[in-house]
Amino acid sequence: MLCLFFAKKGTLKLETEVLHEAPDTFSRTIVKGVLDGNAVANYEGLVTIKKGAKNADADLNERAILLSPHARAGAIPRLEVLENEVKAGHGATVGKVGEDELFYLATRGFPKNEAKRLIVRGFLEAFIEEFPVKEAKEIRTALSKI
């Protein structure tokens, strides 16, 4: 499951749930977000691996980047594992565009807004490649407006 969000204002609440009920199942949940202005995003993800779902393989990850000192993001990734023989992982990170990164790009002639756009593009590009062509094109168009 791939989830992507952009926001400049308002509050976004995103919830995902993945359920493994059978043996030898596989899931990857990847959530990425870019927040600017005074936007707030809260993500809650749950992966449940039921008893009997031996050899299930599950991963749940959320990553958000903040472009404004007023933007906020929170994430609660959760695993509920009721079977012993599984592979399961989860994680979440929220970070901001660093002044060092902006300075580095400024010394190479990039204005601040273009530098932010490049950093966000780098943060998302490999992820965008996972989307179907039409959606990837729409995402890149939206990125050009950041």
What are these regions (language model features)?
Residues 1-103, 107-110, 132-146:
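Conserved beta-strand/loop scaffold segments within soluble protein domains that form the structured core
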Residues 123-133:
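Short arginine-rich
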Residues 104-109, 114-125:
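Extended amphipathic alpha-helical segments enriched in small hydrophobics
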